[in-house]
Amino acid sequence: MGNLKSVAQEPGPPCGLGLGLGLGLCGKQGPATPAPEPSRAPASLLPPAPEHSPPSSPLTQPPEGPKFPRVKNWEVGSITYDTLSAQAQQDGPCTPRRCLGSLVFPRKLQGRPSPGPPAPEQLLSQARDFINQYYSSIKRSGSQAHEQRLQEVEAEVAATGTYQLRESELVFGAKQAWRNAPRCVGRIQWGKLQVFDARDCRSAQEMFTYICNHIKYATNRGNLRSAITVFPQRCPGRGDFRIWNSQLVRYAGYRQQDGSVRGDPANVEITELCIQHGWTPGNGRFDVLPLLLQAPDDPPELFLLPPELVLEVPLEHPTLEWFAALGLRWYALPAVSNMLLEIGGLEFPAAPFSGWYMSTEIGTRNLCDPHRYNILEDVAVCMDLDTRTTSSLWKDKAAVEINVAVLHSYQLAKVTIVDHHAATASFMKHLENEQKARGGCPADWAWIVPPISGSLTPVFHQEMVNYFLSPAFRYQPDPWKGSAAKGTGITRKKTFKEVANAVKISASLMGTVMAKRVKATILYGSETGRAQSYAQQLGRLFRKAFDPRVLCMDEYDVVSLEHETLVLVVTSTFGNGDPPENGESFAAALMEMSGPYNSSPRPEQHKSYKIRFNSISCSDPLVSSWRRKRKESSNTDSAGALGTLRFCVFGLGSRAYPHFCAFARAVDTRLEELGGERLLQLGQGDELCGQEEAFRGWAQAAFQAACETFCVGEDAKAAARDIFSPKRSWKRQRYRLSAQAEGLQLLPGLIHVHRRKMFQATIRSVENLQSSKSTRATILVRLDTGGQEGLQYQPGDHIGVCPPNRPGLVEALLSRVEDPPAPTEPVAVEQLEKGSPGGPPPGWVRDPRLPPCTLRQALTFFLDITSPPSPQLLRLLSTLAEEPREQQELEALSQDPRRYEEWKWFRCPTLLEVLEQFPSVALPAPLLLTQLPLLQPRYYSVSSAPSTHPGEIHLTVAVLAYRTQDGLGPLHYGVCSTWLSQLKPGDPVPCFIRGAPSFRLPPDPSLPCILVGPGTGIAPFRGFWQERLHDIESKGLQPTPMTLVFGCRCSQLDHLYRDEVQNAQQRGVFGRVLTAFSREPDNPKTYVQDILRTELAAEVHRVLCLERGHMFVCGDVTMATNVLQTVQRILATEGDMELDEAGDVIGVLRDQQRYHEDIFGLTLRTQEVTSRIRTQSFSLQERQLRGAVPWAFDPPGSDTNSP
């Protein structure tokens, strides 16, 4: 299929190639005894031995047990044992006394229809073997799913006499059939076979539509792609789906009165059948044949291939100008269509598959064979060669020039083709791969060796073992021959009008059927729900031309990736470059998969997924290595595990963080590593600026790229405009509220909304840690967990808290709702769903996003009413504004990214403030309940140790309050911090624990540690010192004292936990405690990075580079970046190295989990930094939307994966 001589009916292996290298081919010899040494065969059957044979490699005997065929490479002397041959499913055509290996169509290997249904025992045996193969391939052998699937198949066979393959099983089976094809030289690409499932086909008309789409996809404007379309399986008591043509594209052969043939003599019979069925021939040498297609129990029907589908290449020679005048041509796509596909005992008589040509198939076989076009002598005469004697080697010279012309012409036309030297070299690599992976590879030497240059290719010198595995492709009798099956008789000729109408109907169906069967999987990983919302929008867009499904990453089985066609990923990045919580299992499984370009003998390069995700950069030598290999790869290289996957990724994040979109970058990188094909460069949306606009531009580009790749969809841009238009997004008449009998229970409601386990803690105390003279507040919140197992934690972990909105804000918003339900009435939103043919009828369906609750409860506990509305929501509000001016202003804000971002940045308005700015906007209750984002949990570092405070969780929280509009706007409050500060003992707090395994003290207490945390960045370190204090006092340990670097404004106002730290230092927890004061009277401003540089430079270098110690940094993004840069400079200075080298050292420290960061979001003092980042993002986004830069471009200096 990469090269089709293997299985296509272009009969006749090269003459005289039985040779000694075919030993072990006969199935009757079996694997029980080793193949005899070639030296014992008659000398006339042996290739000449090399003059200087290299010594044989040491023999590695297979495990004790049955003897396996011994296979030698006579060129290099290596010897292997083919253990896979013991799994052969079928005897070959040979007998103990006769070798029939050179027969083209051995009768024993033909798939003939059985007179009756297959015996259930035989079918079950084959089915079990295949199901076992499938589950072994996905590493689920013996699992509950495996056993359950076997039981399902057994029950189905018992009830119906047959069974149906799942789609993933069909994909696996079709790829394995190609992998097992012993006559195919191009199998190294078996993993890249694109499988189209056409088992729902019901008529010859539908068959033709599927086939047209197959040709269009596989041809791909000359950049050929291997593909197979599988039609319904053979069923007892019913005729077969059959394609009468041996290939989808063939040239006609017209028998002349003198017995000669004009055109291709191999196709005379099918040409005459087409004429009998109404085709009007053209009588040319290269007329493309129509297709004869047959549905079960119906006569065959004739279909003309639309000319625009068939790509042909006129043949010319690079130096022989007269060659073009010969008028030769050949088609681009070799697509075998008359072979039977067998998978697990099921037979698919119609399963056309295609790849690309090896040049000798055209130049030597099709054009030069005497029983084909037979142009050899004509070319030799034109070359002035002496054709009177064979000793002039005129045949060889002419054949070479014809092959040169074929290669030159295909390359000139930019049509995929491979020469026989490259193809056979790739087959040797495939043999090596298969020997490692499966212990052998079935191969028919007589078909693998090309028809010219035999001993000049490496396969000539390679012994091979031929045997037959399942799944497999098998030959089958022509449908019009032998005992005629029902419906194969010749019917009346069709008129030209009837044929033309059939073509017209088929052309109109093209694309529709393709869209129905090209499935797309859209995966999202989300912390706040925004990635999920984007994924759902992407699903609506792709529904225009594909069959998409939208799944959360934690709902997806990663092994399915190997059988996917198209995957789109939309994901956020959490905290310090980590996956969102619902993406962690996906990330771990993705890292465990193996790929073709990332194997490494060095174990240190197999990093944990979080560490590697945070370390991936273009400067990583491992990444650079496989990217170089990927760029240099071709159709003669092996495909990765995801060889048939096309993918694209969009990441959400903030450029204020040092690991901007790190998880999305890593998924994008990893999918390519595993062999997937990227349709579009990574898209990135910055929450500081234009995130929604960036997503919409990327989504449109991704949709257009996918449509072009799979040859579906007509107007991608129009579809995207339709999907993202405000008129389509929300319609008042499609939503209503329905009264519900049951009221809200808060904890189950939060579990429903956030799709995670929640627990209820209670307040023990809330204490202000700052001086009463301070204008700010930092509180210590003590929670009582009641000993709940779900709230167990380790120091360094995070706690997620679900706060409510302020009651005053909720009441003010309720007063603006135009049609509020009764204040105490629980309601649910219902949406009017359109009916679909064969699906449920139109009707009202409940929106599952929120549990039944009152409108006040929804606005209080579940919906975000304080964040600035998105452009999408502003577009909806513009359609509800009564004043034209307000409508225009809202529309302008929603459409102009820069204007929106400036408005949002200056005002940071809540929803209520937007309504005050645009008072004519009507506010339906269903709009609030369906379009407002969810109120997200707030995360805090745990500030305690369970050993010191069992049953408690402590939080250190800065209470946030600020004014917008340069300090002149309304006062805004932190949702969670303000709520926590107002709680009383006994008040409930819904919460949960999120582990942070990469931010924990080392298990070895003797390793030195440096802790850096200004302000509330000291929070996790309080748990650290409490744990160490417990180890000292309760376990008698003597850990190496740690160093703490703390920062605050003023020693008299906000020096948090000063007394606790002094006590811990006195007890041996800390060796040094250093504090930086940024607002201390009569002292210069000092920050934690200044302390590191001036007082701890030598210690930082010693701890990190000489003593294998650890450094922990906790704080906001600006501080963390400054500390990182300072540490880099310290290592460069103290270690006498270049700055770039120091950056690499920090990368290694991260990989070794010795440089730890716990970074939280933007604070008020980061405005200068974020303003600069927003300016960069604006420039980048505008250039992306103009197409001036790729979606993955980063402005200079913004490589957030490098220190």
UniProtKB/Swiss-Prot annotation:
Effect the entry attributes to changing residue 114 to A: Reduced nitrite (NO) production
Activity control summary: Stimulated by calcium/calmodulin. Inhibited by NOSIP and NOSTRIN.
Assigned EC number: 1.14.13.39
Family: Belongs to the NOS family.
Organism annotation: Homo sapiens
Positions of heme b binding: 184, 475
CDD domains: NOS_oxygenase_euk
Official protein name in the record: Nitric oxide synthase 3
Binding-site list for Zn(2+): 94, 99
Post-translational modification: Phosphorylation by AMPK at Ser-1177 in the presence of Ca(2+)-calmodulin (CaM) activates activity. In absence of Ca(2+)-calmodulin, AMPK also phosphorylates Thr-495, resulting in inhibition of activity. Phosphorylation of Ser-114 by CDK5 reduces activity.
Disulfide bonds: none
Disease: Variation Asp-298 in NOS3 may be associated with susceptibility to coronary spasm.
Record's keyword terms, sorted: Calcium, Calmodulin-binding, Cell membrane, Cytoplasm, Cytoskeleton, FAD, Flavoprotein, FMN, Golgi apparatus, Heme, Iron, Lipoprotein, Membrane, Metal-binding, Myristate, NADP, Oxidoreductase, Palmitate, Phosphoprotein, Zinc
Biased composition (Pro residues): 33-66
Lipid linkage positions (S-palmitoyl cysteine): 15, 26
Subunit structure of this chain's protein: Homodimer. Interacts with NOSIP and NOSTRIN. Interacts with HSP90AB1. Forms a complex with ASL, ASS1 and SLC7A1; the complex regulates cell-autonomous L-arginine synthesis and citrulline recycling while channeling extracellular L-arginine to nitric oxide synthesis pathway.
